[in-house]
Amino acid sequence: MSNFTEIINTYLESYSTYNNGMVEFECKYGSLTFYKPTHPLIIVHSIYILPEYRQRGVCRNILQHLIDSTPKMFKRVRVQTVLSKILYEYLLRFEYKNKKFRLSMYGFDCLL
């Protein structure tokens, strides 16, 4: 999980240096792709966890770390592309520190 934590920290700390569009990171556990829009919003375009690391709470840890570390200038975290039925159902029931993801026409949004 530490690799995903490092990826998230790197993205958030260097947010202003990235061009708008896709920002992709890979690590030994899988990959995390962000989409940087023109307005202040953290968009997770995709979360891919390698099969051997699934069902170990990695996705939960990623979402919790995003909620805990996203600077206050951002009003929400959005998980945009949900192709997996497992992730879709997980986001519907996810709750952390009284924060939940709500399905919108743009993806799953969590107000910070």
What are these regions (language model features)?
Residues 1-22:
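Short amphipathic alpha-helix that is part of the acyltransferase structural core
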Residues 27-32, 42:
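Glycine-rich phosphate/pyrophosphate-binding loop shared by adenosine-nucleotide-utilizing enzymes
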Residues 34-38:
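Short, low-complexity Ser/Thr-rich regulatory SLiMs
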Residues 40-51:
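Conserved acetyl-CoA binding element of GNAT-fold acetyltransferases
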Residues 49, 55-68:
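Conserved acetyl-CoA-binding loop-helix of GNAT-fold acetyltransferases
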Residues 70-83:
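Conserved GNAT acetyl-CoA-binding A-motif
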Residues 82-103:
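Conserved active-site alpha-helix within GNAT-family acetyltransferase domains
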Residues 100-112:
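C-terminal "cap" of GNAT-fold acetyltransferases
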